[in-house]
Amino acid sequence: MDYKNTIITPKTDFPMRAGLPQREPGMLEHWNKIDVYRLMLEKNEGKPAFILHDGPPFSNGDIHMGHALNKTLKDFIVRSHAMRGYYTPYVPGWDNHGMPIESAIIKKNKLNHKAMPIPEFRNACQAFAQDFIDRQMSGFRRLGVLGDWQHPYKTMDKAFEAEEVKVFGEMYRKGYIYKGLKPVYWCPKDETALAEAEIEYQDDPCTSIYVKFALKDTKGKLEAGNTYVIIWTTTTWTLPGNLAIALNPQESYVVVKAANGERYLVAEALLEKTMKAGGIEEYEIVERHEGRYFEYMTAQHPFLPRESLLVCADYVTMDSGTGCVHTAPGFGADDYQTCRRYNIDLIVPVDDRGRQTEAAGKYAGLRYDESNAVILADLKESGALFASEEFTHSYPHCWRCKSPIIFRATPQWFCSVESFKDEAVAACDNVKWLPAWGKDRMVAMIRDRADWCISRQRRWGLPIPVFYCKDCGKPVCTPETIAHISALFGEHGSNVWFEREAMELVPEGLSCPHCGGRTFEKETDTLDGWFDSGSTHIASLRREHPDQWPATMYLEGADQYRGWFQSSLLTSVGALGQGAPFRECLTHGWTVDGEGKAMHKSLGNGVDPADLIRDFGADIVRLWAASADYRADVRCSKEIFKQLSQNYLKFRNTARYCLGNLDGFDAEHLVAPEDMLELDRWAVTKLNELIRTAFEAYDNYEFHVLTHAINDFCVVELSSFYLDILKDRLYCESRNGLKRRSAQTALYLIVDAMARMFAPILPFTCDEIWQAMPHRAGDDVRNVVLNEMVQPYEAYALDAEAMARWDTLIALRGDVNGVLEQARADKRIGKALEAHVALCARDEAAAKALETVKDMDLTALLLVSDVILTDDDPDAANVTGSGTAFPGLRIEVRNAEGVKCPRCWMHSTKANADGLCPRCAAVVAELDLGNL
């Protein structure tokens, strides 16, 4: 008789082939239809909240791998907290204003943007930004990211702009915002000021020069004739702006007389290096004094008709140069402050476009970089050049146009960070920084930073809501003007600032608080984009949900310590007088190629998330984000994704095995802990360990720990051991018998727990599992994310002594399998069920191991037809071997005796007339064979 139909084979609709690229869009459509995000919030409404405030990406390009990493990490956190009972609203946002969009519009339409009406230009920018919001949103949703996609926040929205005006107004009211003329980062190509966070450094070739300034007025302390102060600079073009020479007041300075008769003033610590640069081998020291000795002396500018003052400054170091520092207050922050102390008037001989002005004399009209060579040639010709050297240095560039930038003094609006710096530093104490070094980094950046330049000379930005009195020229910004402009922006949007004249924008009856004047002009600058994004926690989160402020978490790349993290902290302390707007701050690294190199279009090593989703599916992209320790840089390549696909299949196939063997299983079939077989309890105990690992991993945001633990659980504990042993019970035992129901109970608990715990990482696959499995009362079958993660099943757990016994069995099984493989290789057996294994202890360790496992069902656990424990020496005619885990264990593989059961293939000496072993005979007897 053919007993094939008496075997209970796996049956499930859960397919072996994932087909994620084809299957996921339909699942997304269903999730959107039932509004899974809303259901997730409703489930946990009224419970403790976990608020992850979204750092807004800039809306000027399609999503890249950095976006994919960032958004999936956020989704892991939102989903995992939702599945642990937290209320988790997640509102995605976008940063819209700024130079990159302006540049894109100008380039795309070949516009002369200065000739184009500002409202028209801004409308084009807004349409451009909205287009990329839509495209990026589509990409994020395709990744499976849950959020309030119907109501994202946008920094260009009317309500947001209205609230941001209030943020500015409050900081102005407190005296934190002022207008001043001081050096700032300036992009000549884009003709705008830049923030520190908008600067990138690149290595550029450079000519450094040593220049002689002839001493004029020495206050009677030195011989003036033929004596020169030697300065050193890498920015030749700034020499027209030189007004002073700074010395360190405590350092030793010397005047040396060279063989050529000239005398030079330099720092003693840098004397040898300076003389070597100038090719001077013979010289003698004729004077030695501290730097303060030379204070208030003057030196003749090498090519302009004015003198430079010798001043003292503590920041002058002996690391490089001559110790006599070229000081141009229009081009450097330290220079500016030093000259202010000495009441030296400011000059800025470079204009907005980076061209030398009339103040530069004969160099007027030259671009700053073009003037380098001309000035150098003139210095050589006049004899003022002491030396020059070629080298490479790290130089700041604009983050958007990639052009070199300059430092120049211009009238700008500033936020006086100095006024609340101590409070900002103190606020860092109440934040959980992940990694912990984030606190030190943030504190150092705040302590070291200058005042924040918040104005930009651009059109696509939030207008700075300040008026100027036409009578006295002073700025006017009052609570009344702020309230009025906020209301106007809330109703019409900020374009109204450019559509109306100043007198149409001021509140009725406004008079200048300084002079009583009644006519006004409006500010033309716009706010720094970092002020926009730094206000999101107020203009979006706090405005719409004041009870959710401060956010539980900010999560962005490590570059945001000087960007969004910092600007948000400063607006919180400055405008609100509160601490940090986040309780936890988590950072991730960069995405790099498979070799660890930065991905660039020019290198051709970029990877497009859309391509990966098309080829592998969103779940594999998410698995990539979860598998690496994202606190370091995360590598990305097609090869890595192929390997991840293999790991994914191990999880999927494990789930499919469980589901296939749960056909016909319902919650009422669950076996009580006291009735469950010990092997199944071992599996559930291992599952409990995984559950605890999952909770700890989610608590610590260490998703790679979880993915590796699940992979090991599927491969080591399940596939290589437990599931291998289980097949006989599942296929051949009585359908409703305890042994099979015990195994099914364990499989159910395993697949149910894995679907829940891995759902934040693989939402598509885990929901597919969820739809294919049986459920208990209380389960929300609509989507796995609407359910809680399971706690460890402690009632089913084995104690430590029992688990140690299973450790011994697993080690012994490995030893036996090694000898079985040898018997197979020697053609003594085919399958393991053709073997009869005899075990003999030759030392104390082996004897103890056999004593430990002697009462276990070794035949079933070793997957052979019979096992005996013996003291007899092995028969030399059989295949024998020693253990590895237990070297004193002698293992003999004999040919199994008896008849091979045609149903389960076990060999039995007690087969019935049909050749069935006793177990199979009993099971078959229960069946109605006529209906099979």
Each model region followed by its residue ranges:
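Residue patterns forming the tRNA-binding/recognition surfaces of aminoacyl-tRNA synthetases
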Residues: 2-13, 17-20, 26, 30-34, ...
